[in-house]
């Protein structure tokens, strides 16, 4: 597997996907070695992988799924159109490689940019619809609700305020590009401390403008651009959230789309308190699941000895 597919946990949210004007991209190779390269905000190749003109429109629903390394994401407007982005790994698929069906009927598609196909279909207009996208032998289906779900703007705003105000928390990350999986455990402490450890044994500690990585049997320190812990929350800049459902315990499930840290679809489960307990990010070759806990109870993060 290419080393770039093993983006380490926090470096997805803070380093590899951009922090400030100058950041560091950290990758892990198959044999556990680490390479570092400089980048700048918004320079990730993911940003140029696909187009989705409807993605940021306020009257749309954005959903995404993946099967192995195939990503299929959409943005649907009541009454149509529906735009579908299809990317295999980092490669956008042309329109002639994609077939779209609504309620079992193949509908004609027109291009709407790189890797993007637009279809006219009377979705979100009073009855549920099933949209199926087929790229080769891989069908990916979505059940669209009868109407456009209610805005989840207030719920997402509450989640931003609540999670951004925490003194500390823990989360786990499951990251894959469609093949092998990297698991990472992270501790976060406001305002600027973070520690992580992957299932391969890689460890790192960040405190302010200092960073330590465990390499060759010892801790090695170096400078770091600095971080604000809210930027660890990869969903923080998501846009146009929609309420997919309200659970009996009061939790709310949201779907959203955004351009930061890269163009991606997001799914969040938000407690009535505003605490996020689970979040997914679906972007080309980067399929992540975060689970949060130990709110204001995570251990203090200190420089490694």
Feature roles, as predicted:
Residues 3-158:
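Intrinsically disordered, low-complexity terminal tails/loops enriched in metal-binding residues
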Residues 74-75, 121, 133, 171-176, ...:
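Short beta-strand segments that buttress and anchor functional surface loops
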């Amino acid at each position: 597997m290419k080393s770039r597919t093993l983006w380490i946990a926090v470096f997805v949210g803070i380093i590899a996907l951009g922090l400030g004007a100058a950041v560091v991209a950290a990758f892990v190779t198959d044999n556990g070695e680490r390479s570092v390269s400089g980048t700048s905000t918004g320079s990730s190749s993911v940003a140029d992988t696909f187009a989705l003109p409807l993605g940021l429109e306020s009257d749309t629903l954005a959903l995404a799924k993946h099967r192995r390394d195939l990503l299929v994401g959409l943005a649907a407007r009541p009454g149509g159109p529906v735009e579908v982005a299809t990317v295999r790994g980092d490669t956008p698929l042309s329109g002639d490689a994609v077939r779209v069906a609504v309620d079992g009927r193949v509908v004609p598609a027109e291009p709407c940019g790189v890797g993007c196909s637009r279809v006219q279909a009377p979705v979100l207009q009073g009855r549920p619809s099933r949209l199926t996208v087929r790229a080769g032998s891989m069908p990916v289906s979505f059940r669209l609700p009868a109407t456009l779900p209610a805005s989840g703007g207030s719920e997402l705003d509450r989640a931003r305020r609540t999670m951004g105000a925490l003194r500390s928390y823990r989360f786990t990350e499951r990251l894959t590009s469609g093949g092998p999986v990297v698991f990472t455990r992270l501790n976060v402490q406001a305002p600027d401390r973070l520690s992580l450890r992957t299932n391969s044994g890689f460890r790192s500690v960040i405190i302010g403008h200092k960073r330590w990585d465990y390499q060759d049997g010892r801790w090695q320190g170096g400078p770091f651009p600095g971080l604000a812990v809210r930027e660890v929350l990869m969903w923080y800049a998501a846009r146009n959230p929609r309420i997919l459902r309200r659970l009996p315990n009061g939790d709310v499930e949201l779907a959203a789309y955004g351009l930061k840290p890269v163009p991606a679809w997001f799914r969040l489960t938000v407690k009535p308190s505003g605490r996020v307990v689970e979040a997914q990010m679906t972007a080309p070759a980067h399929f992540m699941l975060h689970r949060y806990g130990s709110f204001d109870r995570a251990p203090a993060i200190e420089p490694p000895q």
